[in-house]
Amino acid sequence: MKLSNEQYDVAKNVVTVVVPAAIALITGLGALYQFDTTAITGTIALLATFAGTVLGVSSRNYQKEQEAQNNEVE
């Protein structure tokens, strides 16, 4: 599956900005309302780590593809 530049940028923003903010929010609310947030924040963090890894592989493959195309042009 290929992502457009816009899709990649949105996914990267979600993984690097939105998810950490959501984890902080959930953790803070858990402290205020005295409920355990370990399972949910751990799950979200694991999913974000997986998504970040997939995005990293996607980015690396894109870079290799671009380099190959640039070498063909030269």
Curated annotation (Swiss-Prot):
The keyword Transmembrane applies. Pfam families: Phage_holin_Dp1. InterPro entries: Phage_holin_Dp1 (IPR031612). Keywords: Cytolysis, Host cell inner membrane, Host cell lysis by virus, Host cell membrane, Host membrane, Membrane, Transmembrane, Transmembrane helix, Viral release from host cell. It is a multi-pass membrane protein. GO terms for biological process: killing of cells of another organism. It is found in: Host cell inner membrane. It comes from the Viruses. GO terms for cellular component: host cell plasma membrane; membrane. The chain crosses the membrane at residues 15-35, 37-57. Homomultimer. Accumulates harmlessly in the cytoplasmic membrane until it reaches a critical concentration that triggers the formation of micron-scale pores (holes) causing host cell membrane disruption and endolysin escape into the periplasmic space. Determines the precise timing of host cell lysis. Participates with the endolysin protein in the sequential events which lead to the programmed host cell lysis releasing the mature viral particles from the host cell. This is Holin.
